[in-house]
Amino acid sequence: MIRLSDVVKEYEIGTTALKGISLRIEDGEFVFLVGPSGSGKSTIIKLLTGEIVPTSGQIAVNGFSLTNIAERQIPLLRRSVGVIFQDFRLIEKKTVYENLSFAMRAVGSSPREIKKRIPYVLELVGLEEKTDRYPNELSGGEQQRVAIARALINNPSTIIADEPTGNLDPARSLEIMRLLERINH
């Protein structure tokens, strides 16, 4: 579950990004945050991942209070939240398998867990035949599916997607949205 209560975020340059935002998202909900550029969507994502802290208000994600989270708890929070970025953020010099393995090793997964989980997740996103490919050998839609696989690889309870179809054509966008909806059910 995600809960924001009267959240305010002001940046040092005097810009107020969020003012008094309250929101509750229950487990299993599929929610879209929409709004024009500069409306605070990216700020909310950064708050939910612990990248930044609110100026005031309360934020809870998967049982973690982000208002006063201890530094040592941030890796635990990040394990429970998978993030899909608009620009994919894949490691260009690593294969699909290596990109996913890297994400698993970062949270302490064993080689055995890695070997078992990666084929399962690649099948889930329809990329089981692309395991040895590098990002530059994949289409934009395939790269986005690798980014989704990376978000899923550590079995998070929450997935946050920052404009997951922003760099894709309409057909690929629909494919990605259907994949995300299927994963949610």
Task: Report residues per predicted region.
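Helix-to-loop junction immediately C-terminal to a conserved catalytic motif
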Residues: T49
